[in-house]
Amino acid sequence: MKKFELYEVKDGKLVRKNPFCVRCSNGVFMADHGDRYACGKCGYTEWKNRE
């Protein structure tokens, strides 16, 4: 996936579609797996709310 595909434009501003990894640093995006976000670099996983 290309970096420009991870952003979208809303009201003239760039907005990230996926969060950054809290362990790695800014610039390392987490992958969206439906029920969770996962970092492919360090393996950190963040579960989405199940509401």
Curated annotation (Swiss-Prot):
One GO MF term, please? zinc ion binding
How does the cofactor attach, per the note? Binds 1 zinc ion per subunit.
Q: What family classification does the UniProt entry report for this protein? A: Belongs to the eukaryotic ribosomal protein eS31 family.
Which co-factor is required?
Answer: Zn(2+)
BP terms from Gene Ontology: translation
Keywords, comma-separated and alphabetical: Metal-binding, Ribonucleoprotein, Ribosomal protein, Zinc, Zinc-finger
Q: Tell me the subunit arrangement.
A: Part of the 30S ribosomal subunit.
- What positions does the entry give for Zn(2+) binding? C21, C24, C39, C42
**Zn finger regions (C4-type) covering which residues?**
21-42
One GO cellular component term, please give it: ribosome
User: What is a single Pfam family found in this protein's UniProt entry?
Assistant: Ribosomal_S27
Q: Which InterPro entries match?
A: Ribosomal_eS31 (IPR002906), Ribosomal_eS31_arc (IPR022845), Ribosomal_zn-bd (IPR011332)
Region forming the signal peptide: none
Protein name per Swiss-Prot or TrEMBL: Small ribosomal subunit protein eS31
**Is Magnesium set as a keyword in this record?**
no
